[in-house]
Every structure is written in structure tokens, then in C-alpha cells.
Curated annotation (Swiss-Prot):
The gene coding this protein: tsf
Domain of life: Bacteria
Region Involved in Mg(2+) ion dislocation from EF-Tu: start-end pairs: 82-85
Major place of residence: cytoplasm
Any Pfam family matching the protein: EF_TS
Assigned GO CC terms: cytoplasm
UniProt cross-references to NCBIfam families, sorted A to Z: tsf
Role summary: Associates with the EF-Tu.GDP complex and induces the exchange of GDP to GTP. It remains bound to the aminoacyl-tRNA.EF-Tu.GTP complex up to the GTP hydrolysis stage on the ribosome.
UniProt entry tagged with the keyword Cytoplasm: yes
Lineage: Bacteria, Pseudomonadati, Pseudomonadota, Betaproteobacteria, Neisseriales
UniProt name for this protein: Elongation factor Ts
Originating species: Laribacter hongkongensis (strain HLHK9)
Assigned keywords, A-Z: Cytoplasm, Elongation factor, Protein biosynthesis
GO function terms (MF aspect): translation elongation factor activity
Transferase keyword on record: no
């Protein structure tokens, strides 16, 4: 039997918003499996999915670059340690430099991107100079490059959320779609692209919830399909109500404009990274103990 720690209970409580005892029981039932415990709680409470991996904690910036003709571009996330550095002009310039380097190279991963030459030196050389200047660890976390026969459109919400859309259609429409993605955060373009494991988890949760209603099997099956269809509309770009006109879905908006979306990328700064929490009381105690020694 896995040991259930107070931190595990606290993390599950933060992710689900449910009571401490409920979370502890779910962890015991799942033998310490956090994802399984969250699923157990969703089944019992009817709660929506809350993903621990989605907790935003790290600092940094998202930057985007798109060529003048809108045929190639890149979205990047660069991380640092503090919000102060995240707002530094030199740090933000570095993020933009990395985005341009990613768009103009064939780098397949961050390691390869580090060796790409820029007007100021390689990405890695510029990064090290910036670390020496600002006194913080700075890292290129991820990037996504697009090359299209269509049109690229971008949207940045400050420096914390960035979207790059590949579409067949006007750039102005693309910017609206990119802004919608930043606001509504779809998982993918269409229901056919929803990951099978994600859909299976939702179906399992809905089935368990519907079964608890005590209704006949055929009614339960219809309830489950109804919930699945609603879920698909919520997480797919095409199924979502357009943020600037909720009476119209994005799919209908695109059809009216004879346009289509080939793909998109959305980065949220720090998504999936949990920042280390400083325990200053412990640091003082440790320093005092060291002084006595």
C-alpha cells in the first residue's frame, strides 16, 4: 500500500476543490495514483476535470514570429525565475529573437534550436550572456514552427498567452480565431482529433455518473452520448461558440467566410510547471542551526 502524504492530499484538494477527507479516501482507494484519485472524485462528485498539470506556476514569456508573407512562423516559451525578469526588456527581446530563429530554421527540438545562429550569436550564446547580465536561470522551454501554403495569424495576450493559427482564409479572420483560442482554450480543431485516451476517460466518468441515476440501461446510454457530444463541443475549436458572437459556432463562422483551420498552437507561460515554494522560516532555522554548529 502506497504511503499517502499530506502533500498528496493537499495537491489533490487544490486540483479538485473538494474536502480533505474526500481527497484522502480517494488516494487510499487509488493506492496513491493521483490521476486515478481525481477520476474517482469526479465520478463521485460530478466535478469537471481539473488537471494538476495545468497549474501555472513558472515565470517567463511567450513570443511569436511570423514572416512578412505569413507563410512561416513560430511560437516559443522562454522561462525565467522571477516576474521582475519576465518584464525585463532584454529578456523579452531574447524571447522574440528565439521565435524568429525557430521560424527561420529547421530545428526539431530545443537542443537543436540552441545551436541556431542569429545576428547576436547562437541562441545558446545569447542565452548565457543574458543569464550573466540578469543573474537568473533562463531557459527556452518549447517552440512550435509552422510552414503553410495558407496563412498564419497570431495573437498575444500580453506576454503570458500566445496563439499561432494556420488557416486557409483572411489574416483578419485568423486573428479573430487566434484571439478566440486564447480565450476559450480548445484542445484541438475538430472532434476527430480529440485524443482517444482523453475521450475514453470522459466516457468512463460519464458512464459511472449516469449509472448512479438508477435509470434503465438504454436511457443511461443516451445520457452518456449526450454528455460526450457536449464535451466534444466544449473542447474542439469548431464546436465552440465564437467568443465575439456566442450565437454562432466557430465552424459556422469559418463556413460563412469559406475558410478552414489547418492547425494551431497555444502556449500559456508556465503551464504544467510548478514553481518551487520558498520556506523562509525553514531557511532561517537552518541558518541559525549552522551558526550554532
Amino acid at each position: 500500500m502506497a504511503e499517502i502524504t499530506a502533500k498528496m492530499v493537499a495537491d489533490l484538494r487544490a486540483a479538485t476543490g473538494l474536502g480533505m477527507m474526500e481527497c484522502k479516501k480517494a488516494l487510499v482507494e487509488s493506492e496513491g495514483d493521483m490521476a486515478k484519485a481525481e477520476e474517482i472524485l469526479r465520478i463521485k462528485s460530478g466535478a469537471k476535470a481539473g488537471k494538476l498539470a495545468g497549474r501555472v506556476a513558472a515565470e517567463g514569456a511567450v513570443a511569436v514570429f511570423s514572416s512578412a508573407d505569413g507563410k512561416k512562423g513560430a511560437l516559443v516559451e522562454v522561462n525565467c525565475e522571477t516576474d521582475f525578469v519576465a518584464k525585463d526588456a532584454g529578456f523579452l527581446a531574447f524571447a522574440k529573437l528565439v521565435a524568429e530563429a525557430a521560424a527561420n530554421s529547421d530545428a526539431a527540438d530545443v537542443e537543436a534550436l540552441s545551436a541556431v545562429a542569429t545576428a547576436e550569436g547562437t541562441v545558446e550564446e545569447v542565452r548565457k550572456k543574458l543569464i550573466a547580465k540578469l543573474g537568473e536561470n533562463i531557459s527556452v522551454r518549447r517552440f512550435q514552427r509552422f510552414v503553410t501554403a495558407g496563412q498564419l495569424a497570431a495573437y498575444l495576450h500580453g506576454t503570458k498567452i500566445g496563439v499561432l493559427v494556420d488557416l486557409n482564409g483572411a489574416e483578419a479572420l485568423g486573428r479573430d480565431i487566434a484571439m478566440h483560442i486564447a480565450a476559450s482554450k480548445p484542445v484541438c480543431v475538430s472532434k476527430e482529433q480529440v485524443p482517444a485516451e482523453l475521450l475514453e476517460t470522459e466516457r468512463r466518468v460519464y458512464t459511472e455518473q449516469a449509472a448512479q441515476s438508477g435509470k434503465p440501461a438504454d436511457i443511461v446510454a443516451k445520457m452518456v452520448e449526450g454528455r460526450i457530444n457536449k464535451y466534444l463541443a466544449e473542447v474542439t475549436l469548431l464546436g465552440q461558440p465564437f467568443v465575439k458572437n456566442p450565437d454562432q459556432t466557430v465552424e459556422k463562422l469559418l463556413a460563412e467566410n469559406k475558410a478552414s483551420v489547418n492547425g494551431f498552437a497555444m502556449f500559456v507561460v508556465g503551464e504544467g510547471i510548478e514553481k518551487k515554494k520558498e520556506d523562509y522560516a525553514a531557511e532561517v532555522a537552518a541558518a541559525a542551526a549552522a551558526a550554532k554548529g
